[in-house]
Amino acid sequence: ILGSGDIGLIMARRMALEGCKVEAVLEICPYSNGLTRNIVQCLNDYDIPLYLSHTIVAIEGRDRVTGVRVAKVDERMRPLPDTVFSIPCDTVLLSVGLIPENELSCALGLEIHPKTGGPVVDQHRETSQAGIFAAGNVVHVHDLVDFVSEEAEIAGKYAARCARGEESAARRSLRVWPGDGVNTCVPQRLSLSEGEASVRLFMRAARPMRRATLTVKGAGGDVLLSKRLAVAKPSEMIAVEMDGARFLDSTGDVTVSLEEEARD
């Protein structure tokens, strides 16, 4: 199996339960892109080896797969020729990432974020086109359904308000940018009005970190939030809640960053 995201990990277990011998799960990154519990329950419990910083460089066989050639990769993810070895197998399963399905969003001309692959939304989940709302995996890929449900409630609440003509005029509009250590952050913009309720920010770390500090800053360097995290992983969504009034008082756009504490 090439790829160690949650679907690849779960498929490893499913294949084992169906009677297959899963020879290995290969991951090009130096860390797994799946939840820790899935690594334990889907690989460790079934004695399936996980090769980090490895990828397939060739698939062998003519009419049928007979094996794969695997190599370790360097820090720039380039295969190292002197590390190549073979794994005999008759099936290769590719689990190489999810992309939100956004044919409708593109047809409507919505602004699409280049990293999430979904529409750019504000804290109410309203897209770049007034009156059109989006939530869940169409906005960005989630690892937990709890956050999908939460986003759906937000989008439904404000879509209903919009339909009833109860929207408040935005006093300020600003962008939310991922800074150092952050790969993506949703919402990507904020439409703020007086009495703005709490704002939830959802983000993914750019790399695994232990004892990291999450910082939200205004353009002038004013710190709106500083929170310590025991661990941050690209595979696990980070969610923080902030008082909407804090953004009204900030200067300019907002940047969200993660910094790992120095290790001993």
What residue ranges belong to the model's regions?
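Surface beta-strand/loop "capping" patches
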Residues: 167-208
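Glycine-rich Rossmann-fold phosphate-binding loop(s) that bind the pyrophosphate
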Residues: 3-5
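FAD-site-proximal beta/loop scaffold in flavoenzymes
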Residues: 90-142
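A conserved FAD-binding loop/helix module that cradles the flavin
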Residues: 135-180, 262-264
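A Rossmann-like FAD-binding core segment of flavoenzymes
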Residues: 9, 13-103, 197-231
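Short, aromatic- and glycine-rich surface loops/edge beta-strands on solvent-exposed regions
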Residues: 201, 212-216, 242-264
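Conserved mixed alpha/beta catalytic, RNA-binding, or beta-rich assembly cores of soluble enzyme
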Residues: 112-114, 151, 168-171, 214-215, ...
